[in-house]
Amino acid sequence: MNSNLQEKYLAILQEELVPAMGCTEPIALAYASAKAREILGCEPEYIVAKCSGNMIKNVRCVTIPNSGGMTGIETACILGAIAGHSENKMEVLEKVTEEQRAQTKKLLEQKRCEVEFLDSDIPLHFMVEVSAGADSAMVEIRYSHTNIAKIEKNGETIFIGDENEATGGGLTDRSVLTLENIKQFADEVPLNLVRPMIERQIRYNMDIAYEGISGDYGLGDRKSVV
């Protein structure tokens, strides 16, 4: 495999193995909500999340990281707007205080976030609109979890991102991926170039597995199997 193609494959591997705090779809919603709040310039009074059917399916019953056990799209959006730091991207909810969790619960009870169905053929596609008084902001994400396709402030478009599926979000072009090249990369890549990424992945996955065995999560299938 030539060095140029190998570099692209290494870049793709790095992009696909980005650590995320929790299930990726709700984290993406929290990221968009945090970004929208930054554009708005203040804490929003109301949030509307327009989500594709696939997003709704993948988030509606998922526990949101650092939420204290709360679930769903509304929680992800409200917590992201209150406590999220968009510069941390997929670790946007890394730092959440008890006060912010309590505030999120209160806003959920007040129904400050509404979820709407977004009719889209793109599985990962959603928009988060936030508003306060007469001001509003909107962040649209397509294709990948942090690929911002559009940002609006008070109805005016202030940013247009990459809407191409293969390159969206500044990612390496996936069109270079073929079965033949993937096998060649796996056979020939020097281990020292992939070892740090793979070892981190193994460590994280083992930590998750041990936590699943020791804690009470979901239906408890892992415990019953072990």
PLM regions with names:
Residues 2, 17-26, 191-195:
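Short, N-terminal intrinsically disordered low-complexity segments that are rich in Pro/Gly
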Residues 8-21, 181-187:
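Generic N-terminal amphipathic, Lys/Arg-enriched alpha-helix
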Residues 14-22, 32, 50, 59-64:
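Short glycine-rich or small-residue beta-strand-to-loop segments that form or flank ligand, phosphate
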Residues 22-27, 67-71:
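Short, conserved micro-motifs enriched in small and acidic residues
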Residues 26-42:
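Alpha-helical support elements that line or immediately flank enzyme active sites
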Residues 45-47, 51-201:
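Catalytic-core signal marking the mid-to-C-terminal active-site face
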Residues 198-202, 209-214:
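Active-site helix-to-loop segments that bind/position phosphate- or nucleotide-bearing substrates
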Residues 225:
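Conserved small/polar residues in nucleotide/adenosyl-binding loops
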